[in-house]
A protein has these predicted regions:
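Aromatic-residue hotspot detector
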Residues: 40, 48, 81, 232, ...
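Non-catalytic, mostly N-terminal accessory regions of nucleic-acid modification and defense proteins
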Residues: 1-218, 277-286, 291
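A generic secondary-structure signal for well-formed alpha-helical elements
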Residues: 42-55, 189, 240, 244, ...
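Conserved S-adenosyl-L-methionine
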Residues: 196-306, 311-318, 326-328, 339-340, ...
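Conserved Class I SAM-dependent methyltransferase catalytic core
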Residues: 14, 21, 30-43, 210, ...
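Gly-rich Lys/Arg/Thr-decorated short loops/hinges at beta-loop-alpha junctions or inter-strand turns
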Residues: 188-191, 320-326
Length: 375
């Protein structure tokens, strides 16, 4: 426990310095996954360490063997993510072959490979993380001029996170501070990427307007078919809280085509203390195949909100649930799939449901099949 709580400004400054460490080695589009991954590892380990200390105090009367059995049983940790030995920040371990493995904070060589093993271990120990980490974050990949990042750079980044705050809620100025800091990182990388950053981030002011139009309420199901980093779903829950409701009494659903962005979204939900929502974020092409199903068909929701990718192509022969597009099919080529997203959103509404979306102005004026769909 620290005397002075960590403020959002302090945590943002800390994360800025993380980016500085990597900035000289590669473009921001290449290193964003590394900072997201490192932050996630540190947060999970810090939470785990806190729960582990509580278990040790609670069971201090037991023998060493009995206590260790409890400490290594992931069922002992309740809602806290279980961090296996391979992924622990502060504690090394000796394996069955009597080989000692350093804690993350003490990594010195083959660091990219070791960090990948840590990610894989924590994913394999927590079902909700299946497919999120090891398939989408690769600390050992080549960047820039086809070179792997040097151990010295990884060591600097690890040392920076090790010198920073312990990332547990009790140390935060407000409960959702880490989630807010994660949103700050997402905006930082979107701004750095310029126009391309729009694939995973929509400005907060725009999201806020859409959410105010939708007016989500407790007990509803809210869906974003092009979820990106998840900001629209998160703001929907926050809106309910601002209206005096319980943000955990809204079910959030999303789907994202890009693998790394999908992983960023799932981690975003977890860092906003909403693991249920993380489990409801699917990875896949929404136009081709909506993955949220109910009674053998695509699921319907009380509220649908999205900023679909503008001007995309699609392949009609691959499309499932064609009944979603009752107004007609837009051209497959020429980057004119915008009204396909609109129709999917309409088809995904429950009776008396409401949707809000962002579209390029071309959908209002283009002729051909798009004109027929509008009519």
């Amino acid at each position: 426990m620290i005397k002075n709580k960590i403020s959002l400004t302090q945590l943002e400054s800390f994360l800025d310095k993380s980016a500085v460490i990597l900035r000289g080695s590669m473009d921001s589009s290449e290193y964003k996954e590394f900072i997201f991954g490192m932050l996630f590892l540190k947060r999970m380990s810090d939470q785990f360490d806190k729960k582990r200390e509580e278990l040790m105090k609670k069971n201090s009367h037991l023998s060493k063997e009995e206590l260790n059995e409890i400490l290594e049983d992931k069922n002992s940790y309740g809602d806290t993510f279980f961090v296996p030995k391979r992924a622990r920040w502060n504690i090394g371990f000796t394996d069955k072959e009597s080989v000692f493995h350093s804690a993350i904070k003490d990594y010195k060589q083959n660091i990219g490979e070791e960090l990948n093993k840590a990610l894989a271990a924590i994913e394999e120990s927590n079902d909700i993380l299946e497919g999120i980490l090891k398939s989408n974050i690769n600390f050992n990949k080549t960047t820039g001029k086809n070179q792997k990042i040097k151990d010295s750079v990884w060591k600097d980044l690890i040392d920076h996170f090790n010198s920073g705050p312990i990332l547990i809620n009790e140390n935060f100025e407000f409960p959702d501070l880490l989630g807010a800091a994660y949103e700050y990182l997402i905006k930082y990388f979107a701004d750095s990427a310029g126009k391309k950053g729009g694939e995973f981030y929509t400005p907060n002011e725009v999201v806020r307007l859409l959410v105010q139009i939708l007016k989500p309420k407790e007990g509803m199901e809210v869906y974003d078919p092009c979820v990106g980093s998840g900001g629209m779903l998160i703001q929907s829950a926050q809106y309910i809280e601002e209206q005096g409701g319980d943000p955990h009494r809204v079910a959030l659903f999303g789907q994202e085509k890009a693998g790394t962005v999908w992983a960023i979204c799932a981690m975003n939900m977890i860092l906003h203390n909403n693991s249920d929502a993380a489990a409801n974020i699917e990875h896949g092409d929404t136009i081709i195949n909506p993955l949220h199903k109910h009674n053998g068909t695509y699921r319907k929701f009380h509220r649908v909100i999205a900023n679909p990718p503008f001007s995309q192509n699609y392949n009609r022969s691959e499309v499932k649930f064609e009944q979603r597009f009752s107004y007609g099919f837009a051209p497959e080529t020429g980057k004119k799939a915008d009204l396909m997203f609109v129709q999917h959103m309409i088809a995904s509404l429950k009776d008396k449901g409401v949707m809000a979306t962002i579209m390029p102005h071309g959908v209002l004026f283009r002729g051909g099949r798009e004109k027929l769909i509008r009519e």
